[in-house]
Amino acid sequence: MRINSVHGFANDRVWHLSFSEFIAIPRIFPMRVNCCHDRDLLVGWAEKSRTQIQLRTSQQGSCRMNVDEQLKQQLDEFRKDFQRLKSEISKVIVGQQEILDDTLISLIAGGHVLLEGVPGLGKTLTVRTLADALHLEFHRIQFTPDLMPADLIGTQVIAEAGDGRKVFEFQKGPLFSNVLLADEINRATPKTQSALLEAMQEHSVTVAGVTHILSEPFFVMATQNPLEMEGTYPLPEAQLDRFFVKLLVKYPKVSDLETILDRTTENLKPRAEAVLTGEKILQMSQLSRMIPIANDVRRYGIALVVATHPDHELASVSARKYVRYGASPRGLQALILGAKIRAILDNRYHVARDDLKSMALPVLRHRMILNFEGQAEGISADDVIRKMLADVKEDALAA
């Protein structure tokens, strides 16, 4: 059947859709369909997830999405698991709730996180605690100016085979883990920083012409010091774009400092226990991708991204004045994936514009390069994004 040819449905008629047709529903019917009768309904059966979706018309002719009990249970479990993981990490990490939310969203979405802040704010401890709470293999690499790519990936060593022959054998580096902490990544040279590129994007590394697949989930959490500190190298644009979000770690509140002292200066030291597995994280990732997004909301996300492009007709005033290069398509992908998870956490079964707005700062701030005028005036990427969110109209790309 051709769904996009349907404008109204006969009473009590049921359409049984394939999975590909089911996925097309949010694009064809962006939650507003003009139907003829009050009792009309469209039923789509998602074969892969065994999930039934119903679109029912109201007397005004608009449709609302009813998610069946099975999917509701899955999404309720998603929220409970997310909160359980966050609560376990919070036993060790004091405050920084927004940082924890965006970090876990990135993990579930299959992305990587870049944390920026001065030393001593708990960036390294956050990554260690996350690995403990997930019972995943964890490795830490302290980036220094003399660190070489082989120290990260691994190298070929000469070994003796069973028959006495000498053969080359690949000795894996610390990159082969589920959770990798790249500590103070901007203290290493660009050559070593670039060694992470293939691993972060392809989840594999190539050594001596042989490709080695990394185990899933693979999550890189890098920390960096502000660039104005001595001995730092700015990350190349290609590597910055590989990070799902960039999070700015701020100083804790006074009340949080008191709690930190209570937890760290007494005999009992809190420690996170494993509450989820890597397999569970992968399941949550697959479930989050099933959340539909209406066509007009998707177009609003596109409008936000192109508004960062100074040469685009929809560019915001601040982008035209202060931005040299805007966000890439990878930034749009991260914006949508993050918004889907935000929708689940907000107990909704579709993406709203507010979900996109809430992800705009962490997703876009490191994907924009300011021009000389912006740098000279002390303008930050966050300033440009906030102005852009105020300027971009919700129907900027209306069909």
Q: What are the functions of these language-model segments?
A:
Residues L75-F78, V92, T232, K246-S318, ...:
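Conserved C-terminal "switch" segment of AAA+ ATPases
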Residues A161-L180:
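Conserved alpha-helical scaffold flanking the Walker A/P-loop in AAA+ ATPase domains
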Residues L107-T144:
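Walker A/P-loop
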Residues V67-E69, E313-A399:
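C-terminal engagement/docking regions of AAA+ P-loop ATPases
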Residues E137-P149, G209-I213:
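Short beta-strand-centered segment that lines the nucleotide-binding/catalytic pocket of NTP-utilizing
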Residues A159-D163, A188-T192, M200-M290, K340-R342:
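Canonical AAA+ ATPase core
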Residues D76-V113, V118:
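Pre-Walker A (pre-P-loop) alpha-helix and adjacent loop at the N terminus of AAA/AAA+ ATPase modules
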Residues D183-E184:
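Walker B catalytic acidic pair
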